[in-house]
Regions:
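Hot-dog-fold acyl-thioester-processing enzymes
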Residues: 1-82, 147-155
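Short alpha-helix capping/helix-loop boundary micro-motifs
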Residues: 85-90
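HotDog/MaoC-like acyl-thioester-processing domains
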Residues: 1-10, 93-155
Length: 155
């Protein structure tokens, strides 16, 4: 499937998308610590905590951007938003500079209002490793383009 349209969603169960590899560096780790106040909450250094270890919640926060960059979804026919997570597991460590590979598999598509709830299994794996670093089951809502605009006009 090259570009998935809104009308393609009901038949997309089982579709797998591979994202481009990415790596997180010191700049991203520092920015995340500052934005989430981890730099304030953990003032005392924990000597046994490796400085190069990527925080699990930083990986989780990458889901949306990495999925958007990997997605063949047509932004001209639909738009989506976060609906929630059913399950998240941090299985293996990720360290600064390691290349992370992302995979997204559509597990379910269910009608919801004028759109669909879409469940994707999102897997991040460090390149060269067998075990995934993180697996998250993530629900999104997808609506046909124009739905939000029409709702705003009625408000």
């Amino acid at each position: 499937m090259t570009e998935m349209t809104f009308d393609d969603l009901p038949q997309s169960v089982g579709h797998i998308t591979q994202g481009a590899p990415f790596a997180l560096g010191e700049e991203e780790l520092d920015a995340f610590a500052k934005a989430t106040w981890l730099d304030k909450a953990y003032l005392d250094d924990i000597p046994e905590f490796p400085e190069t270890l990527v925080e699990g919640f930083l990986l989780l926060s990458m889901l949306d951007a990495a999925a958007k960059l990997a997605s063949p979804a047509s932004s001209s026919t639909m738009w989506g938003l976060n609906y929630g997570l059913d399950r998240v597991r941090f299985i293996a460590p990720v360290h600064m500079g390691q290349r992370v590979l992302s995979t997204y598999e559509i597990l379910a598509v269910e009608p919801k209002d004028n759109g669909y709830k879409v469940l994707r299994r999102c897997t991040f794996t460090v390149e060269g490793q067998d075990r995934p670093a993180m697996v998250a089951d993530w629900w999104s809502l997808a609506f046909p383009r124009g739905t939000v605009e029409r709702a705003r006009e009625r408000s």
